[in-house]
Amino acid sequence: MDNSTIVFIAVLGVAFIFLRWLIAPIPPQLPNELNEALANSVNNSNRPNNSNNSNSATNSNANRRGRREPSDDMIEVVQTIAPQLTRGQIRMDLERSGSVEVTMERYMETGSLPFPPGESAATQSYQSDISEHSQATKKEPENLIDKYDLKSKIKGDEGEGIENIDENKWGSSKEERSSLLNKKREEMILQARKRLASQLQNEVAL
C-alpha cells in the first residue's frame, strides 16, 4: 500500500469523525442554560426600572418630609372662613400647599377643595347637617369678629388693622408658634371680611 492510499484513508477517517461531531444531538442541559441566560437578561433589564422607582419614591418621601405637617390651628383657620369644607378636604390641601394662604386662595378661586380618597360630597352634606343642627341649638349665632374679639382691629381700611406676618417665619417655641398662628387667623378673617364687603359693593353697583 503506497503513501497516497494511507493519506486518503486517514483523511476519510478524520472527515467521518468531524461529520459525526457536527450531527451529534444537542445535550439536554443546553436548553436549561439558555433559559437561565434569558432569565438573567430579563432581570438585568428590570433593574434600572426598579432603581428609578426607588429613586422616585425616595424623592417623594423627601418632599413630604420637607413640608410642614398641617396643625389643628391651621385647619381651624381655614374652617372658620370656609365652614362648608370638611377637615379632610382642608388637611389634604394643606399637605399639598403647606400654606394657609395658598389653600385659601385656591378655595376663593374654585369655591371648594378636592375631596380626599374615601370621602365624597355625601360625607360633606352629612357633616354640614350636623353642623347646622349644632348651630341651631345655640341661643345666638356667634360672629367671627365677636368670637375672636377683632372689633378693635377693624379700622377705616380693614386690612390695616393687623400687622403683616412673614410667611417664611416659623416660631422656635410652642408659644411663639401659637401666637403666630393666632395672628395669621386674625389676618385671614379680616381679609375675608374685606373681600366680602368689596364683592357686595360690586354687586350693588351692578
From Swiss-Prot:
Compartments (UniProt record): Endoplasmic reticulum membrane
* Keywords, alphabetical: Endoplasmic reticulum, Membrane, Transmembrane, Transmembrane helix, Ubl conjugation pathway
How is this protein positioned relative to the membrane? Single-pass membrane protein
Residues spanning the signal sequence: none
**Stretches assigned to the Cytoplasmic side:** 27-206
Indicate the transmembrane segments per the record: 6-26
GO molecular function annotations of the record: ubiquitin binding
The CUE domain, residue ranges: 70-113
Q: Where is the composition biased (Low complexity)?
A: 41-63
Instruction: Give the Lumenal membrane side ranges.
Output: 1-5
**Entry's InterPro entries?**
CUE
- For bias kind Basic and acidic residues, which ranges apply? 130-158, 166-179
User: Which residue stretches belong to region Disordered?
Assistant: 41-73, 111-179
Presence of keyword Nucleus: no
Q: Which GO terms describe its cellular component?
A: endoplasmic reticulum membrane
* Record keyword Cell membrane present: no
The UniProt subunit note reads as follows: Forms a heterodimer with UBC7.
**What does this gene product do?**
Component of the endoplasmic reticulum-associated protein degradation (ERAD) pathway. Recruits the soluble ubiquitin-conjugating enzyme UBC7 to the cytoplasmic face of the endoplasmic reticulum membrane where it functions in degradation of misfolded or regulated proteins localized in the endoplasmic reticulum (ER) lumen or membrane via the ubiquitin-proteasome system.
Family of the protein in this entry: Belongs to the CUE1 family.
What's the protein called, per UniProt?
Answer: Coupling of ubiquitin conjugation to ER degradation protein 1
Q: From which organism does this entry originate?
A: Debaryomyces hansenii (strain ATCC 36239 / CBS 767 / BCRC 21394 / JCM 1990 / NBRC 0083 / IGC 2968) (Yeast)
Encoding gene per record: CUE1
